[in-house]
Amino acid sequence: MRPSHRVLTVTCALLLATAWLSSTAGASEPLSDFNATFQSLAVNSKGEALVTYQRADGKVRHLLAWGAVNANAPTDQAVPQVHFKYDYSGGWGKYHKSSYWSSFANKCAPYDGPALPYVVAGCKAPDGSYWAIQSWQRALPLLGFDPWKPQQTAFELHLSHWSGELPKLEVYGHWTYGGAWQGLFGRLTYGGSPVHGFGATGDGNPLDRYGRNVYIDTFNSVYGAGWKRESGILVHKPTGTFCHSFVPQKPFPGYPSQETRPAAPGERYRVTVMGPGVTPVIQWEGAGLTAADRQAAASVTAIWDQVMTGDGKCAPER
């Protein structure tokens, strides 16, 4: 096949909690105010961001965020991943000034950084770093199921802050299991180092701020027209790699049906992941495979051998 890989970006620091006092939160902890309507992003000369949005109940919230940029590499589990501190009262928790947000001096210049998917706002801080807000439906059900719970359709607001190099998401399409099925494999790195966590639940949810899941969508497949969520996969330790084959699968417990879902290769694929620390979510998109791509199978296998070295979990899909 003709391998392609493209690096884009989105955000990765999610907003949490409803506390009045200052709190800390990891970059991958979702905001409790789902489906909020973004209003403004401001950044002052002290490195604080003020995010103003309207909650679904109509109430306006002024969120103060500070204390984090970029990400740490997962070299030592004892070293915490970077994360924002939040004051959901707009300054009362940090400064005991109820009007702090109203006199916030915005010094952020127009955004001139890399293109971001799902972006609703971005700007360039006085120190040259970037801040961004994006809105994303991360909780869609897997295996192409239509949402059946309100929270599955929720839009999350994500805040990010970074300078310099962005995370890199490599994704390649290939034929798996002797050419019977289409699949994707790839690797998530930051600053040349693999991104991974140190622990996860049995169903693949990270147990620390280092771990990340990639979310795979398929376009115009047997699931129906448009984009449908196929899978969510934990990136592997210590390689930062992942793989997925579009094969028939049995739905998860609690899904509306337990009938085996058909293989769902699509015309296009999309892979999205929240970057490490407070870096942006990044996204790759590429074309599905065709019969002509089989002629390049050997070259893609060579890429697999280079990218997936050390990943024993994915070896059967080589």
What kind of region is each of these model predictions?
Residues M1-T11:
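Bacterial N-terminal signal peptides that target proteins for export
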Residues L16-A17, V51:
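Membrane-embedded alpha-helical segments in integral membrane proteins
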Residues A17-A25:
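C-terminal segment of classical bacterial N-terminal signal peptides
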Residues G26-R318:
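Extracellular, repeat-based ectodomains that mediate carbohydrate processing or recognition
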